[in-house]
Curated annotation (Swiss-Prot):
Database matches in Pfam families: C1_1 (PF00130), PH_16 (PF17838), RhoGEF (PF00621)
PROSITE patterns: DH_2, PH_DOMAIN, ZF_DAG_PE_1, ZF_DAG_PE_2
Protein name per its UniProtKB record: Rho guanine nucleotide exchange factor 28
Induction comment: Up-regulated in B-lymphocytes upon CD40 stimulation. Up-regulated by PTK2B/PYK2 (at protein level).
Region (Interaction with PTK2/FAK1), start-end ranges: 1292-1301
PTM characteristics: Phosphorylated on tyrosine upon stimulation of cells by laminin.
Length: 1700
């Protein structure tokens, strides 16, 4: 079962869905309940079936944060609730719950700012609160408000004139639902008008906040509203709550441990189905709460006064309007308040079957002053359409017109009726001491809310009765007399029944005449057909003629279930209740005989006339009705009807059936075969095709009829359902409480008969009389309870004795159902999450599936045991009253079986819970073997052997007893009903017994499958292997016990069949009789049919019985056994001197030779086959060997010889014990050595090498161990070791030369004391074992070295192999060591056994002469043959030892050779290692040299790179010089001398440009030649230097010099006139000068390189230094200066001319 939600808030009210598996079908006609079980509370809620396997319900509120168990219970008629599944839901405390608790506690401490301060702890804002509106209301609904609490706070506090209330807070938060809910709480109306400290009411706050919805609701509010829920406290522990919003009715019970689940569900059903009673109880609860409310919580002072006077404010008005309120109906707002609750309760009835006679309209009419009340079913003939007056208890009359009567036929008519304790004028009826009913003068107090709620009384039943109209037609309660009254009238309208309160209401509005005729009401449903429920029936019949206005009425106590063909009459129930709802007593009075009116006279008294609407009333008594019902005409009718009903009931709907398992035919009780079998589609009865006519009636149809006819008690009788009635006796003059719980099986058995003067002996007889109208017409005769119980089973409705509550232990079944629900999946992989399953390995999944199957089948087995125990055995003991010993023969050891398997399952369940990984759903059980070992070993194993041995032994006996009991009709009916039980799951007793006997055979299969997917060499694998062996031993022991029991039973059967007078004569003349076989020591060992060959060659059929001391031959005669008499030979042969030999050339014959002291005798016996002959010979030989000694055998022995023999035996036993102890000690030492080797291996770092520190054999004193298998295993391990060593050798040869060297270690050479017979083996074995310590730490290495030196005196260096091969070698050595040690232990034990056998043989040989007289030559020959066989076996043992020693020596030689090869290889490897080391050192030196060379190379490379850079710079310089030379050649023709004035700004600007561009740059612009002389002397007006103009154009060239250029300073400080004179000279003057100096210029160009390393001379610097205007240039050419006028260069006044 899966639940749709796992967490809910504390207030609940969430819809939950429960989905079951596909194989689970939920019946449509059953009721389902959700049971929420917590630590202190239990909630019961009804559930709806929405699909075939889905249920829907509502989660109730809970008061504690915890995880509760959710159980789904199924209820069907006649059965106890059955748990279908279980789950869990966690209740959590959310924000709405915390805020609701805060509002309740802070109600009297609110201020104007509380709407903000209260939200601070929750980090909420006012804008987020509307989402919590509905949740807050639900949380407040769930809370239990403190005593005296109101909306204004504690009622004990004085209410101030101005204070903040919860209504103000709800308006400020804008929560309309919370506001309406608070209005319904105590003090809500007063808080609505109460202003706060700011003098504002909630209405003012709503207007200010703009909450139009709240403003409208407050404005239209005219009174209190329903709070949305109703709560009823039944007692201190039980509470009912109905929530209108979710339409949920919840029963909450405290102290769940003290309540049975079944009782709680019954209590819930009582109130759920009896709604009028529920509403009345809710009204009383409301009145109680109102009456106990303190005055401080009252709304006004007037209400307080009314409260003290015991009347509500509306009662005075209702007193004046009583008639009008009944006819006109309730007010508008009352209708609005009632309708939701009506619809809510009607909603609860959806898809539910309402009982057909749930309730009947109840009226109280007091005739002649109201002194007498008629409680029978009144049939009032109303003819005419005139208005009818009805007199109520107060004398008020209700006038009902036809129109108003018709208007009340609908659902609104249900709201016009109030129960008597809520009506202002109603008076409850109290029983006086004389048994009559008087009207009490007390009045009931009604509050406005309770009066509105009470009006729902009638409406609850209407919805159900409208659904069951067709069903009611079939069950109308009219007698044959009513048919006579109705003849000739029109057809009747469909009957409509009203459900009213349990007490009659005098204010009930009634329809008019025609409508009254269409009504038919039955107040006694229990008298109709079914007897399962009892009703408080009151009837006080008086025949008075002074009736009010002579109204003619008829009164009946019961009615025939016939459909009235005429016009039905209105049947009114005048049942009145006493003030005590727990007990109701009425009296049956028999009027005088002369006032009885026969049926034929009824018509003359019943004359329909409109004017006679108020005339005479005639009452009938029970005696008349009894006579009427048993009339001959009715009897004949009932017989014909019974015949048809029985034929109809017997009809099955057979279809071809398919069955799983062994089933029996319901008709002949034989095994069913699939092809010839039929199955009823209704009751699932199985039968052969030829036996279908003999099958009992269809139980399903009977069950449906039973459910249909089973009545529900009317509203007035609900409160007395569960009142126990231990003893019931009816007396004609006394009143009797007859309320009984429905379905109680004790009822019929505890009814005592009445006196003979009463026609109906008991109330049960009366009810049976009513039921007999369908089943049997003569059921008035007295019958014993047991006869009626079993004879009517299956054919009569009186099956309530078996339709009773189940006897299954509820808590036990609930626990088991939850376990079964947990293991209902098909496999483990379907239980866990798919993601979790996908992460597991394939073998793990398969292993978990098998473990899950083991646990699942264990749960099913426990269920089968529970079915046998609680369904069948308990019912057979308690219901059938069978003898306990008889029942225990059918179910032997059942309690012990159940206890054992439950303990086993709980152990596995605990392991499953411990293995959970992250969540309860995901689990992986890693260990299950230890639980299996614990279950099938020691005490548990012996217990299971005993229990299963006894159970399986008595299987046949139980089945035969069961078949014998099935001959009883009572037992057959019981078994059929129990088989149809839901808990039985269609399993009968034979199936259950067979399943139990087969259970132990399932364990080996499951354990083998678990073992298949378990890793070997693990503790789990060993445990599983051990558990498997234990299980097989247990099964073998059970089989042996079953075989022994069967043989014992067979021996007893044979003894019973042996003729008492038979006898036979022995060889010694003694007579052997049957009585001699009755010895307790004799047991049957083997039996079978053989053939005794006579002297004439004929064969006689003989029954041969092999007992513990004799062999019997019996033959059958007249179905009895007698001693066989063949050839005058005795048919009793003693086993003391019996020898069995084969017959030559006859494979099926054998000779039995008896060498008795009286004389030998030989028998020739033949069997059916050779195998049977060999089996007989083997069993005879075993019996002879184990045969006890003959009584007279020891008489001839002397006491001294006996004492000597005993002393020898004692000495042999002592020697055997000593040898066993020594063997045990040797085995212990060997295991200790293995343990030490394992520890050394772990310390040496071989984690992957595993060694079990246990020997492979156990010292068993019973049988010596077999050494051949150990020897073969040792040889195989030696071969694997040889292969591993060779593989490692080849790997080492091909190993790389760069492998790092390893160290050396010394081998451990242990002492040679371990194997005395073969010291070399011990030396080699332990020497190889010592190699496991090859890389130990220095400290341990020293210890090993010392040990080796001290033991062997030599050192052996060892070189390690590669990692993988070395681990394989070490592992092989470890395994070989273990095998050799085990072999050594086996040989030691075998030697001990050999010595013991030698002593035994010597003892026998010494005793042989003294016992020679007992045997003869044949027995001596047999002994010699046995000794010869022993010698052969001993020789075989010595031969095996010799072979083992040879193999051991050969293996030692092989080991020595391998060791020498390994030592040689080790020395070669060491030499190779030294060579590698020298080569490594040489390589290191070469590497250092190469590093040095590399460093020098890098330095040279750096220098080379620097030289390359220098060459590149020189190459660049050359390119520049070449470019400059070409440029000079190109510009020489066009260059002109430029004369600069010394003080000109152009020169200054040119200087500045020089300094900006480069220190050693000189720019020559040929544009100077074109410049005007006028502009050369003018300053630069714009202030822009010359170099700012386009100097980078094509007319400018840059000449770069070397690092040490020659400075040439030109003095241009000539006057302006000179400059202008020079510039004014035309080109013709300058051109010749250039041509003359061109050669010198080219000559200077050729000398360009001479200026790279020269610097300017000091003379030039001195001459050119102090000039005011200078031009600095850098040039590689030495340009001569020509004076324009031939002046000196040193003169500053000379004009400097530069030629380019």
């Amino acid at each position: 079962m899966e639940l749709s939600c796992s967490e809910v808030p504390l207030y609940g009210q969430k819809t939950v869905y429960a989905k079951f598996g596909k194989n689970v079908y939920l019946p449509e006609d059953a009721e389902f309940y959700f049971v929420y079980g917590g630590s202190h509370q239990r909630h019961v809620v009804i559930a709806d079936r929405v699909q075939d396997n889905v249920l829907q319900s509502s989660i109730p509120g809970h008061w504690l944060q915890e995880t509760v168990t959710v159980s789904v219970c199924l209820c069907s008629e006649g059965y106890s609730p059955v748990t279908m599944g279980s789950g869990s839901v966690t209740y959590v405390d959310n924000m709405a719950c915390r805020l609701a608790r805060l509002l309740v506690t802070q109600a009297d401490r609110l201020t104007a700012c509380s709407h903000q301060t209260l939200l601070t702890p929750f980090a909420l804002t006012v804008e987020a609160l509307p989402a919590l509106d509905e949740e807050l209301v639900l949380a407040l609904t769930q809370l239990e408000l403190p005593l005296g609490w109101t909306v204004l706070g504690n009622s004990s506090l004085e209410v101030s004139l101005h204070r903040e209330s919860l209504l103000h807070l709800a308006v400020r938060w804008a929560l309309p639902k919370l506001f309406h809910f608070l209005l319904c709480l105590p003090g809500g109306v007063k808080a609505l008008k109460l202003p706060n400290e700011e003098a504002t009411t909630p209405l003012d706050l709503a207007l200010q906040g703009g909450h139009s919805t709240l403003v409208e609701d407050i404005t239209n509010f005219q009174g209190s509203h329903s709070p949305g829920f109703s709560r009823l406290r039944l007692n201190e522990e039980a509470t009912l709550q109905f929530v209108h919003s979710s339409e949920t009715l919840t029963l909450t019970v405290n102290h769940t441990a003290e309540h049975l689940l079944e009782a709680d569900i019954k209590l819930f059903r009582k109130y759920f189905w009896d709604r009028a009673f529920l509403v009345k109880a809710l009204e009383q609860e409301a009145k109680t709460e109102k009456a106990t409310m303190p005055s401080g919580a009252a709304e006004t002072e007037e209400e307080v006064r009314n409260l003290e006077s015991g009347r509500s404010p509306s009662e005075e008005e209702e007193d004046a309007k009583s008639i009008k309120s009944q006819v006109d109906g309730p007010s508008e707002h009352e209708d609005q308040d009632r309708l939701p609750l009506d619809r809510s309760f009607d909603g609860l009835k959806k898809s539910k079957h309402v009982p057909a006679s749930l309730a009947a309209g109840q009226l109280s009419d007091v005739l002649n002053g109201g002194d007498e009340v008629y409680a029978n079913c009144m049939v009032i003939d109303q003819v005419g359409d005139l208005d009818i007056n009805y007199i109520n208890l107060e004398g008020l009359s209700t006038h009902t017109s036809p129109e108003s009567g018709r208007s009340m036929l609908g659902p609104q008519a249900c709201m016009h009726t109030l129960p008597p304790d809520t009506s202002p004028c109603g008076r409850p009826l109290i029983e006086n001491s004389e048994g009559t009913l008087d009207a009490a003068a007390s009045q009931s107090f009604v509050t406005p809310s309770s009066s509105r709620t009470s009006n729902l009384n009638l409406s609850f039943g209407l919805h159900g009765f409208e659904k069951e109209q067709s069903h009611l037609k079939k069950r109308s309660s009219s007698l044959d007399a009513l048919v006579a009254d109705s003849e000739g009238e029109g057809g009747s309208e469909p009957p409509i029944c009203y459900a009213v309160g349990s007490q009659s209401s005098p204010r009930t509005g009634l329809p008019s005449g025609d409508e009254l005729d269409s009504f038919e009401t039955n107040t006694e449903p229990d008298c109709n057909i079914s007897r399962t429920e009892s009703l408080s029936l009151s009837s006080t019949l008086h025949s008075k003629e002074s009736l009010l206005s002579g109204i003619r009425s008829r009164s009946y106590s019961c009615s025939s279930p016939k459909i009235s063909s005429g016009k039905s009459r209105l049947v009114r129930d005048f049942t009145v209740c006493s003030t005590s709802e727990e007990q109701r007593s009425y009296s049956f009075q028999e009027p005088p005989g002369e006032k009885r009116i026969q049926e034929e006279e009824w018509d003359e008294y019943v004359i329909p006339a409109k004017s006679e609407s108020e005339k005479y009333k005639v009452s009938r008594t029970f005696s008349f009705l009894m006579n009427r019902m048993t009339s001959p005409r009715n009897k004949s009718k009932m017989k014909n009807k019974d015949t048809k009903e029985k034929e109809k009931m017997n009809r099955h709907q057979f279809v071809p059936g398919t069955f799983s398992g062994v089933l029996q035919c319901s008709g002949c009780d034989k095994t069913l075969l699939g092809k010839e079998s039929l199955q009823c589609a209704n009751c699932k009865a199985n039968t052969h095709k030829g036996c279908k006519d003999a099958v009992p009636p269809c139980t399903k149809k009977f069950q449906e009829k039973y459910n249909k006819n089973k009545p529900q008690s009317i509203l007035g009788s609900s409160s007395v359902r569960d009142v126990p009635a231990p003893g019931l006796s009816l007396h004609p003059s006394s009143s009797m409480p007859i309320g009984l719980p429905a379905g109680r099986k004790e009822f019929a058995a505890q009814v005592h008969p009445l006196s003979r003067s009463v026609p109906g002996t008991t109330l049960e007889s009366f009810r049976r009389a009513v039921t007999s109208l369908e089943s049997e017409g003569d059921s008035w005769r007295s019958r014993s309870h047991s006869d009626e119980l079993f004879q009517s089973m299956g054919s009569s409705p009186s099956t309530e004795s078996f339709m009773m509550e189940d006897v299954v232990d509820s808590s036990l079944w609930i626990d088991l159902s939850s376990d079964a629900q947990e293991f209902e999946a098909e496999s483990w992989s379907l239980v866990v999450d798919p993601s979790f399953c996908s992460r597991q390995e394939k073998d793990v999944i398969k292993r978990q599936d098998v473990i899950f199957e083991l646990m699942q089948t264990e749960v099913h087995h426990i269920q089968t045991l529970l079915i046998m125990s609680e369904v069948f055995r308990k019912g057979m003991k308690e219901e059938l009253q069978l003898d306990h010993s008889t029942v225990d023969k059918i179910f032997p050891c059942l309690d012990e079986l159940l206890e054992t398997h439950r303990h086993f399952f709980f152990s596995m369940k605990e392991r499953r819970q411990e293995s959970c990984a992250g969540s309860d759903r995901n689990f992986v059980i890693n260990q299950i073997g230890d639980i299996l070992v614990q279950q099938f070993s020691e005490e548990n194993a012996s217990k299971m052997k005993r229990i299963y041995g006894e159970f399986c032994s008595h299987h046949k006996e139980a089945m035969s007893l069961f078949k014998e009991l099935q001959q009883n009709k009572k037992f057959q009916n019981f078994i059929k009903i129990r088989n149809s039980n839901l808990l039985a799951r269609r399993r009968g007793i034979p199936e259950c017994i067979l399943l139990v006997t087969q259970r132990i055979t399932k364990y080996p299969v499951l354990v083998e499958r678990i073992l298949q997917y378990t890793k070997e060499r693990t503790e789990e694998h060993r445990d599983l292997c051990k558990a498997l062996g234990l299980i097989k031993d247990m099964i073998a022991a059970v089989d042996l016990k079953v075989s022994e029991y069967e043989k014992n039973q067979k021996w007893l059967e044979i003894l019973n069949k042996i003729e008492n007078k038979t006898y036979t004569k022995l060889k010694n003349g003694h007579v052997f009789r049957k009585q001699a076989l009755l010895s307790q020591e004799r047991a049957l060992l083997h039996d079978g049919l053989v053939y005794w060959k006579t002297a004439t060659g004929r064969f006689k059929d003989i029954l041969a019985l092999l007992l513990t001391d004799v062999l019997l031959f019996l033959q059958e005669k007249d179905q009895k056994y007698i001693f066989a008499a063949v050839d005058q030979k005795p048919s009793v042969i003693s086993l003391q001197k019996l020898i069995a030999r084969e017959v030559a050339n006859e494979e099926r014959g054998m000779f039995l030779i008896s060498a008795s002291s009286a004389g030998p005798e030989m028998y020739e016996i033949h069997t059916n086959s050779k195998e049977e002959r060999n089996n007989w010979m083997r069993r005879i030989q075993q019996a002879v060997e184990s045969c006890p000694e003959e009584e007279g055998g020891r008489t001839s022995e002397s006491d001294e010889e006996r004492r000597k023999a005993e002393a020898r035996v004692a000495k042999i036993q002592q020697c055997q014990e000593i040898l066993s102890n020594q063997d045990q000690q040797i085995c212990t030492y060997l295991e200790e050595k293995l343990h030490i080797y394992a520890e050394l291996g772990e310390l040496s770092g071989f984690e992957d090498v595993h060694l079990e520190p246990h020997l492979l054999i156990k010292p068993d004193p019973g049988e010596p161990p077999q050494a051949a298998s150990l020897l073969a295993a040792a040889l195989r391990e030696a071969e694997s070791l040889q292969v591993a060593v060779k593989a490692s050798k080849m790997g080492d040869v091909s190993q790389s030369s760069e492998e790092s060297p390893g160290g050396t270690v010394l081998m451990d050479t242990p002492s040679t004391q371990d194997v005395p017979a073969s010291p070399t083996a011990s030396l080699v074995t332990e020497g190889t074992e010592g190699r496991g310590c090859w890389d130990v730490d220095p400290g341990l290495q020293g210890v090993v070295t010392d040990l080796a030196v001290s033991d062997a005196g030599e050192k052996v260096e060892y070189r390690s192999f590669s990692g993988s091969s070395q681990s394989e070698i070490i592992q092989a050595i470890q395994n070989l060591t273990r095998l050799l040690y085990s072999l050594q232990a086996a040989l030691t034990i075998q030697d001990s056994h050999i010595e013991i056998h030698k002593l035994v043989l010597q003892q026998r040989e010494s005793l042989a002469p003294s016992h020679s007289f007992r045997g003869g030559p044949l027995q001596d020959q047999e002994k010699s043959r046995y000794l010869e066989k022993q010698r052969e076996e001993l020789a075989n043992i010595h031969k095996l030892q010799h072979q083992f020693q040879q193999e051991q020596r050969r293996w030692h030689r092989t080991c020595d050779q391998q060791q020498r090869e390994q030592e040689a290889q080790e020395s070669w490897l060491q030499a190779r290692e030294r060579e590698c080391q020298s080569q490594e050192e040489l390589l290191l030196r070469h590497r250092s040299e190469l590093d040095h060379q590399l460093q020098e190379y890098q330095q040279s490379l750096e220098r080379l790179r620097e030289g390359q850079r220098m060459v590149e710079r020189e190459r660049q310089k050359m390119r520049v010089q070449q470019g400059l030379l070409g440029h000079c050649k190109h510009s020489r023709q066009r260059s002109l001398p430029a004369v600069f004035s010394p003080g000109s700004k152009e020169v200054t600007e040119l200087n500045r440009a020089e300094s900006l561009c480069h220190e050693n740059s000189f720019f020559i612009n040929e544009a100077f030649g074109h410049m005007s002389l006028n502009t050369s002397n003018k300053p630069n007006p714009s202030g822009v230097p010359w170099d700012a103009h386009p100097l980078e154009g094509s007319h400018f060239d840059l000449a770069r010099t070397s690092e040490s250029p020659t400075e040439l300073k030109i003095d241009i400080s000539q006057p302006p006139d000179v400059n202008s004179e020079l510039w004014t000279t035309g080109p013709g003057h300058q051109r010749p000068a250039l041509q003359e100096n061109s050669k010198e210029s080219y000559k200077n160009v050729a000398d360009l390189d001479s200026f790279q390393s020269e610097s300017s001379s000091p003379q030039d610097s001195n001459q050119r230094g102090p000039q005011p205007q200078t031009l600095t240039t850098e040039a590689k050419l030495s340009l001569p200066m020509a004076a324009g006028h031939g002046g000196d260069a040193g003169d500053g006044a000379e004009e400097n001319i530069l030629y380019l």
